[in-house]
A protein has these predicted regions:
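Flexible, acidic/Gly-rich N-terminal and inter-domain linker regions that tether
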Residues: 1-78
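Functionally constrained cores in energy, signaling, and assembly domains
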Residues: 11, 29, 37, 79, ...
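Short N-terminal micro-motifs specific to bacterial/archaeal maturation
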Residues: 22-25, 103, 130, 181, ...
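Conserved Radical SAM active-site core
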Residues: 47, 51-177, 186-187
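C-terminal scaffold of the Radical SAM
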Residues: 170-179, 184-204
């Protein structure tokens, strides 16, 4: 007999999601949300950051996506939100205009929440955050708003595999599916092609 799946974020203790949001915003003020450890107050400036993202996330596009794994796509698509900018500098990136040039528009958490609810209304089976590592606070804030307004589908964290442990702890029991796109098993290649240190240690 089929059972109804309930997303992890709906099972958090009362007030826990808000606490995670508050913690994440504090970390953004001395940013250590990825292993770059830029320690820049991103609520005030993007100068000195690698990801070039500030207090507001930049969204390149959102909509039902049918190019993901079949278990995510189902019949109506994976509800994908593509975030602009990135904490990696991959020379081979297929979305260079998004990840390196930052094409897209700034979106407040309320707007991202509205996107999530729209994707749910369109029948998408999940919310798929693509390139999320540098916008964890913004995502958590949006999830908190969307959950209060009726979001009831699973969350997918579609990452490049360069996430700080603190970020993963903030996302624990919020995200349902982690989908790391691991790019390197050789540290020298990570430095050469993505200008990143400790990549292999970070994704383990």
């Amino acid at each position: 007999m089929a059972t109804t799946f309930e997303p992890a974020y709906l099972n958090l203790p009362a007030g826990e999601l808000k606490r995670r949001v508050d913690q994440a915003w504090v970390r953004l003020e001395d940013c250590d949300l990825c292993p770059r450890d830029c320690h820049v107050n991103r609520r005030q400036t993007t100068k000195g950051t690698v990801c070039r993202a500030g207090e507001r996330a930049v969204v390149a596009s959102f909509g039902p996506h049918f190019g993901e794994e079949s278990c995510l796509v189902g019949r109506h698509g994976s509800g994908t939100i593509f975030f602009s900018w990135c904490n990696l500098r991959c020379q081979f990136c297929q979305n260079y205009d998004i990840s390196q040039l930052g094409e897209g528009r700034e979106a407040a958490p309320e707007e991202i929440a509205a996107m999530m609810l729209d994707l749910q209304e369109r029948g998408c089976h999940n919310i798929n955050f693509v390139t999320p590592s540098h916008v964890v606070p913004q995502i958590l804030a949006a999830v908190a708003i969307a959950a209060e307004r009726g979001l009831r589908i699973p969350l997918v964290y579609n990452t490049g595999g360069y996430d700080a442990l603190i970020s993963l702890k903030l996302l624990d029991s919020v995200v349902d599916i982690y989908m790391p796109d691991v790019k390197y098993a050789d540290e020298s290649l990570a430095r050469k092609y993505s200008k990143v240190r400790n990549y292999t240690a970070a994704h383990k």
